[in-house]
């Protein structure tokens, strides 16, 4: 969740400095991450939390070819119970993330978690008007598993199986309008993610798989677009299109902004060479867009 208020291999420098009993600092991908604990966790939990945040930062840095902001403050609310929730990213001059962690959270729960990576992806995109909120959440929903997979933290079977299951939740229902005018949970998160997938595939088709969505997103960052600034969506998309050399995002936005669009997902999965039986994804590398699938997921 994001609020406006308050596959290339790159060398990533990781340093961990314990600043005080209730704080730590990471330096990853050119960014500094200051971690503050609202209450001091036991040392084993502290280490798991710091490692979990570092893993997410490395994943995001791999996808964006560097950490998306120079500095971010991460406030970890350590409380009773198990699990990770209540993640939020905030922008303006001093980007920060708030997230809650239960004292009894296990190593497996940290390993499986998507929340902190999702929030870090929010750092890499400008704040846009409220009616465009779907692009912020959709982008984080789409990029998070891909970034984790490219960093070696998720399997290809996992990311594509989850996409097959999830993307259908983003299809318009009866009475829905375009993405700018239908703000249900499914259309905001998965409808936005579907927009990103369609854009990623189309960019790769038009550029012979030389460019992908990440190249456009990196172009936004290089032009100064991050959570620290507020841009109109059309400016943001045009900036990304200039980076890829093809006007895919602007054209797709014009198509989907006001009008409900229902792409043939079954055909898309077939073209990408993805077969999903409800439990496990398998792949057909002879499919026409198999190379696109591999380039997106990094596998």
Predicted features and spans:
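Juxtacatalytic substrate-recognition/specificity segment
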Residues: 22-128, 132
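Soluble non-cytosolic domains of exported or imported proteins
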Residues: 43-55, 106-111, 115, 130, ...
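Acidic/His/Gly-enriched intrinsically disordered linker/tail segments
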Residues: 130-200, 205-207, 213, 218-227
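Bacterial N-terminal signal peptides
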Residues: 7-15
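Beta/coil-rich, acidic/histidine-enriched accessory regions frequently appended to metallopeptidases
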Residues: 32, 226-299
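N-terminal export leaders
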Residues: 2-6
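Sec-exported extracytoplasmic/periplasmic mature domains
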Residues: 58-65, 122-125, 145-152, 200-208, ...
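Boundary at the C-terminal end of the N-terminal hydrophobic targeting segment
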Residues: 18-20
């Amino acid at each position: 969740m994001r609020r406006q208020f308050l596959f290339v291999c790159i060398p990533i420098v990781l340093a961990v400095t314990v600043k005080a009993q209730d704080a730590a600092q990471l330096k990853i991908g050119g960014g500094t991450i200051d971690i503050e604990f609202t209450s001091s966790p036991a040392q084993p939990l502290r280490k798991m939390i710091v490692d979990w945040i570092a893993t997410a930062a490395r994943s995001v840095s791999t996808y964006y070819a560097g950490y998306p902001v120079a500095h971010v403050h991460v406030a970890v609310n350590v409380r009773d119970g198990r699990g990770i929730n209540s993640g939020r990213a905030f922008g303006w001059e001093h980007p920060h993330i708030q997230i809650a962690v239960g004292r009894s959270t296990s190593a497996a729960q940290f390993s499986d978690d998507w929340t902190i990576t999702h929030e870090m992806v929010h750092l890499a995109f400008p704040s846009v008007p409220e009616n465009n909120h779907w692009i912020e959440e959709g982008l984080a929903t789409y990029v998070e598993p891909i970034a984790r997979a490219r960093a070696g933290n998720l399997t290809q079977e996992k990311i594509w199986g989850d996409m097959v299951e999830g993307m259908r939740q983003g299809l318009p229902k009866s009475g829905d309008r375009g993405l700018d005018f239908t703000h249900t949970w499914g259309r905001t998160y998965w409808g936005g993610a579907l927009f990103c997938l369609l854009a990623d595939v189309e960019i790769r088709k038009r550029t012979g798989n030389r460019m992908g969505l990440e190249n456009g997103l990196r172009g936004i960052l290089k032009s100064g677009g991050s959570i620290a600034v507020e841009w109109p969506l059309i400016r943001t998309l045009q900036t990304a299109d200039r980076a890829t050399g093809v006007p895919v995002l602007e054209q797709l936005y014009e198509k989907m902004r006001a009008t409900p669009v229902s792409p043939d997902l079954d055909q898309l999965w077939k073209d990408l060479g993805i077969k999903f039986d409800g439990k496990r994804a398998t792949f057909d590398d002879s499919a026409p867009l198999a190379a696109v699938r591999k380039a997106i997921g990094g596998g």
